[in-house]
């Protein structure tokens, strides 16, 4: 991939590129694009950027009276778009118009600031998200006249309600079935092939997940904060486009199906010395999980701020339909070795492997903005390190099966049960974010999410009529 402006121009010429997609991310986390002629690219434009953006039309960006904005390509993200011959794409940084500098609510800017902050503190960090998703044949929505009622119907060839006449996957029985029961393996493989060949990924695994109706997962090799966030956005973009080519619909919403597992983005995290030579999470003399005291402080910070983090890593009303007991989703704020009923799991596959020592933070889902999510996780972790926050003892039991009294005795709290509750927590616990998250991004994010929650609260749910029509 290109690394300089000169490389970009060479890449465009050698690949006979006619059009370039300028892509950027809004505050909630949606990817946007504008397509421009490749012949607009020259050394000057790659230095000054492209004045192509009306920021007043992008959620969380600007008002109509200050709407002119500039997109500056990031050369190392320039790649071919394999399903669009003659077209390339590049991720962009967002700047104010008029030479006023970097736009402070650009999510990628927040992630870049987080990386700078950790470097100043003497650390580097690595992230390994596990992206789950559903792949449906079709989704029908009925929302055109919400006053008369709303509804939806999911069509999925693997689902128990399917009339496809082929194998179905029962609820909660979708983990690792071999083909032909796993009917969508070939599409997942095409997605990861595309990521490897055109976008430079190292893929660790792809497989069917626990839920029915085409739930899958893709795991790629861990990387640094900004690069991993770029990769999350790119993976979602590629998966949706490859699926669409096959007439399928990929969704990363956390809980599209009642009664089955939701979609998460469990995130593996480790902190190292700034030069990347020593894993600070690792202690070979720790008998419990080879986790160092430094690593325990990281855990302490994440647990302390877990309720506030929920507003960022579980950012939609739908997220809290996933975060309920009984569906392998984290609910209880505790940590443990190899325990998937806790918010934080210390993977325990091997011993004596410094490079592999990490923690897994389980609450995130892929509806999050990855730039903000990874930056927030880092800030919570560093707060734990700087304040030496002890996480307490690990809980080596199935926390779902503990009585409320037992959980109280162990001091185990719960994650928020709604987006509004999570936003309340973020408003009361955001000081740890402020070295990186400016007040503009925090206030804008909270306002956007309050509006989202308020809007959805106004719609009667179809099941409410089932339960209450005879009141």
From Swiss-Prot:
GO terms for cellular component: cytoplasm; membrane. It is found in: Cytoplasm. Residues 15-99 form the GS beta-grasp domain. InterPro entries: Gln_synt_N, Gln_synt_N_sf, Gln_synth/guanido_kin_cat_dom, Gln_synth_cat_dom, Gln_synth_gly_rich_site, Gln_synth_I, Gln_synth_N_conserv_site. Pfam families: Gln-synt_C, Gln-synt_N. It catalyses: L-glutamate + NH4(+) + ATP = L-glutamine + ADP + phosphate + H(+). The modification O-AMP-tyrosine is found at residue 400. Residues 107-471 form the GS catalytic domain. GO terms for biological process: glutamine biosynthetic process; nitrogen utilization. The keyword ATP-binding applies. Gene3D superfamilies: Glutamine synthetase, N-terminal domain, Glutamine synthetase/guanido kinase, catalytic domain. GO terms for molecular function: ATP binding; glutamine synthetase activity. SMART domains: Gln-synt_C. Its EC number is 6.3.1.2. Keywords: ATP-binding, Cytoplasm, Ligase, Nucleotide-binding, Phosphoprotein. The activity of this enzyme is controlled by adenylation under conditions of abundant glutamine. The fully adenylated enzyme complex is inactive. Belongs to the glutamine synthetase family. NCBIfam families: GlnA (TIGR00653). This is Glutamine synthetase.
């Amino acid at each position: 991939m290109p690394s300089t402006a000169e490389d970009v121009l060479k890449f465009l010429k050698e690949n006979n590129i006619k059009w370039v997609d300028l892509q950027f991310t809004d505050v909630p986390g949606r990817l946007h694009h504008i397509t421009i002629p490749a012949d607009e690219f020259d050394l000057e434009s790659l230095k000054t950027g492209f004045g192509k953006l009306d920021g007043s039309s992008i959620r969380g960006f600007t008002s109509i009276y200050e709407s002119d904005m500039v997109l500056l390509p990031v050369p190392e993200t320039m790649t071919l778009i394999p399903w669009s011959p003659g077209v390339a794409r590049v991720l962009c940084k967002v700047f104010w118009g008029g030479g006023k500098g970097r736009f402070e609510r650009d999510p990628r800017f927040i992630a870049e600031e987080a990386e700078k902050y950790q470097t100043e503190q003497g650390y580097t960090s690595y992230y390994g998200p596990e992206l789950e998703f559903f792949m449906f044949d079709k989704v029908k929505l009925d929302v055109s006249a919400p006053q008369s009622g709303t509804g939806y119907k999911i069509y999925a060839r693997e689902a128990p309600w399917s009339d496809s006449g082929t194998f179905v996957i029962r609820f909660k029985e979708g983990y690792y079935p071999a083909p032909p029961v796993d009917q969508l393996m070939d599409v997942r493989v095409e997605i990861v092939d595309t990521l490897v060949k055109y976008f430079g990924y190292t893929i660790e695994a792809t497989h069917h997940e626990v839920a029915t109706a085409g739930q899958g997962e893709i795991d790629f090799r861990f990387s640094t904060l900004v690069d991993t966030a770029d990769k999350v956005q790119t993976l979602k973009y590629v998966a949706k486009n490859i699926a669409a080519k096959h007439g399928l619909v990929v969704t990363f919403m956390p809980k599209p199906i009642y009664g089955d597992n939701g979609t998460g983005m469990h995130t593996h995290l480790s902190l190292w010395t700034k030069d990347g030579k020593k894993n600070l999470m690792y202690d070979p003399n720790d008998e419990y999980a080879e986790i160092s005291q430094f690593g325990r402080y990281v855990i302490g910070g994440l647990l302390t701020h877990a309720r506030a983090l929920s507003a960022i890593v579980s950012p939609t009303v739908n997220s809290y339909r996933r975060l309920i007991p009984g569906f392998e989703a984290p609910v209880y704020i505790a940590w443990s070795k190899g325990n998937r009923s806790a918010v934080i799991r210390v993977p325990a596959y091997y011993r004596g492997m410094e490079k592999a020592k990490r923690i897994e933070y389980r609450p995130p889902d892929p509806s999050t903005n990855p730039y903000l999510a990874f930056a927030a996780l880092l800030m919570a972790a560093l707060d734990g390190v700087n304040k030496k926050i002890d996480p307490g003892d690990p809980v080596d039991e199935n926390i779902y099966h503990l009585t409320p009294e037992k959980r109280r005795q162990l001091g185990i709290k719960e994650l928020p049960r709604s987006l509004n509750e999570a936003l309340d927590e973020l408003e009361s616990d955001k000081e740890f974010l402020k070295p990186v998250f400016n007040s503009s991004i925090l206030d804008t994010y909270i306002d956007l999410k309050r509006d989202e929650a308020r809007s959805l609260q106004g719609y009667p749910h179809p099941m409410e009529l089932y339960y209450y029509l005879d009141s």
